[in-house]
Design a protein with these regions (language model features):
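Interfacial segments of alpha-helical transmembrane regions
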Residues: 3-15, 61-83, 151
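A hydrophobic membrane-anchoring alpha-helix module
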Residues: 120-173
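Juxtamembrane transmembrane-helix termini
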Residues: 27-30, 59-63, 90-97, 155-166
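Alpha-helical transmembrane segments and their immediate interhelical/interface regions
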Residues: 32-79, 172
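Extracytosolic (periplasmic/ER-lumenal) interhelical loops and adjacent juxtamembrane/interface segments
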Residues: 91-137
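C-terminal TM-helix exit segments that contain a strictly Trp-centered aromatic cap at the helix terminus
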Residues: 19-28, 79-94, 112
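Juxtamembrane loop-transmembrane helix junctions in multi-pass integral membrane proteins
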Residues: 1-8, 34-40, 61-68, 130-137
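Transmembrane alpha-helical insertion/packing segments
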Residues: 1-48
Length: 173
């Protein structure tokens, strides 16, 4: 049986992240949206977050192992938030101001550093406002999801730190 601490953090956050990932794929399929390079990167980071949380649930590690998994999950969430924030910013820029005029299909054979440069330079397909719900675009929803997932991981890290400080303080008395 898994410790209660793992069930209360990693399993629910895994479900939240998995739901967000499935929703992104379902929206793409239902609305016929073509994902740009930033969308694909956000989904990869979200999938990484899901895998980290799922691994933490399956491993059932002690407090130190949980902390490492939470740090890794926080890294994926912050990376996803950075990519989503960049995507939101690019959607506010005029298409003529984008540096990269080449779509993702043409970038596949290039080196990783060139691909990374073009990832953050932007492409015309990253600028398109193709869908919104409650006046928020899909990258804005992704940004909110990544911030929420980062808050979950950070909360777990801070709670573990507070627990360690309190137990250390009680041992000294």
């Amino acid at each position: 049986m898994l410790p209660a601490r793992l069930r209360t953090f990693f399993f629910p956050t895994c479900l939240v992240a998995f739901t967000a990932l499935v929703t992104a794929f379902k929206l793409q399929d239902a609305l016929g949206l073509l994902p740009c390079l930033l969308c694909v990167t956000q989904r990869a980071l979200l999938a990484g977050y899901v895998l980290v949380c799922l691994s933490a649930v399956l491993h059932g590690l002690a407090l130190e192992g949980q902390r490492r998994y939470a740090q890794l999950a926080l890294g994926f969430a912050l990376g996803g938030a950075a990519v989503a924030a960049r995507h939101v910013w690019l959607q506010g820029v005029a298409a003529d101001d984008l540096v990269c005029p080449v779509a993702i299909d043409h970038n596949a054979g290039q080196y990783w550093n060139e691909l990374a440069r073009q990832l953050f330079s932007g492409a015309p397909d990253c600028n398109a406002l193709t869908w919104s719900f409650m006046d928020l675009t899909l990258p804005e929803w992704s940004l909110m999801a990544f911030v929420l997932l980062a808050a979950f991981a950070l909360g777990h890290l801070l709670a573990g730190r507070l627990h360690a400080l309190l137990t250390h303080d009680l041992k000294q008395r």
